Amino acid sequence: MHSTPDYRAMLAVALEEARTGLAEGGLPIGAAIFRVQEDGTVALISRGHNRRIQLGDPSLHGETDAFRNAGRQRSYRDLIMVTTLAPCWYCAGLIRQFGFRTVVIGESVNFSGGEHSLRELGLNVIDLADPECITMMRDYIAANPTVWNEDIGID
């Protein structure tokens, strides 16, 4: 029997990506994809951050950046998507489409997005309610409401 992965350590990778995105002038949303190996160790597959502002690509959310960086995988069912913020509907659709079974969320206080739909589909959704994720996103939204609304598709 394997022990539970250290989700907070996994979130630390996504948080580092979120900080990078913020430093680049973008939204502070990061993601990382991991695989739990047969022996219980956790391997980082990829990482990414929201680069919508930096590259002018409205589809380049944190989860999609990490997904693209993962390249082709034979299966996504045994991978864990870790994100600093609850996935929006677009990213939740990607998670569903490719069959991820576990999603670790840094926070859903500032935005719950498609979290509930993922739970309803039977995915293992782990919300860590991380204080740094909550504060970073709250402060960003307060300082950049127009950019934030654009990111989640609100006019």
Region annotations inferred by a language model:
Residues 22-26:
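Short loop/turn motifs at secondary-structure junctions and domain boundaries
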Residues 28, 80-84, 104:
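Conserved beta-strand segments that form the floor/walls of ligand-binding pockets within enzyme
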Residues 29-39, 43:
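Short beta-strand scaffold segments in enzyme catalytic cores
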Residues 45-48:
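A structural microfeature
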Residues 58-92, 97:
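Short HxH-centered metal-ligating active-site micro-motif
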